[in-house]
From Swiss-Prot:
Lipid-binding residues (covalent, S-diacylglycerol cysteine): C26
PROSITE patterns the record matches: PROKAR_LIPOPROTEIN
Protein topology in the membrane: Lipid-anchor
Recorded family membership: Belongs to the MG439/MG440 family.
Residues annotated as signal peptide: 1-25
Entry's localization field: Cell membrane
Predominant location: membrane
GO cellular component: plasma membrane
Provenance organism: Mycoplasma pneumoniae (strain ATCC 29342 / M129 / Subtype 1)
Protein name: Uncharacterized lipoprotein MG440 homolog 1
Disulfide bonds: none
Lipid attachment residues per UniProt (N-palmitoyl cysteine): C26
Keywords, alphabetical: Cell membrane, Lipoprotein, Membrane, Palmitate, Signal
Amino acid sequence: MNKKSIWSKTAFGSLFLLLGTAFTACSNYDFQANLTSLNQLRTSANKDINLTQDKNTLIDALKTAFENNSEGTTKVLLDAWKFSLYDAKILEKQDPVKFVKAFGSGKSKEDIEPSAGVRGLRFVERFGDNTASLIKNAILLDQQKVEVFNIRFKSSRDFTIQIKLNAKGNYKKSEVEKYKSQIGVQDNELGDKEEGTLEADLIFTYTPPASNLFSKSNFDKLTKSINFNTNLKLEMVGKDEVMRKILNSSAFTNNLASVNYPNQAVNLLPYVLYSIL
């Protein structure tokens, strides 16, 4: 083998190592060593658009941060959730460009957790598709405002997150009666008014699940998600006479006023993206 060939292989190897080192350096972010605030993420996102343009890059970076400081990183993820709902008020009005980048095309506030929609209230999970559709037509709570978002987090085994939504909407007596006839109930609880307004407070309380606690395995590039596992208690409090009648009628919604849902996963990645875009 001549000297030129040896030099070429050596030079190529050195160049490969140099490029590899440079790539590794570019892939490291300041916040990964000790993530403690949402502003650290925002600062890095302003310096490197890959964090907001490539979800897998963001997931990898946050996973490394979690491995170095699980408590601090989890608190930041939860803070991003709170910021998106409480400060940015995405249930009331979304920035359309940011929302598509964070949640994906074809998504709506039905995909926000929590919400007063069919998905947020777990109507399908509780009653099935057909009944859920009937309830949706009977009770439409389409105006939502987050009034309280409290986070108490010590570890994945010890946390409480409570979110209170005020929801307003409308009902149509004909649709309510249609639902009640489906379940064999005949009464006149709503009086003679054909339609009217509704208002309720919805209280979502998230606590640790019995198993599958939040860990680095929940940072999933395949599904592009960071799933935070919880048990959910959902309570509805009627703020007007009609809503109170509906919630107090076990025949109408099978005690919808207070329901427990185990093993509920909240994908925190869209809220992180929305809060740093």
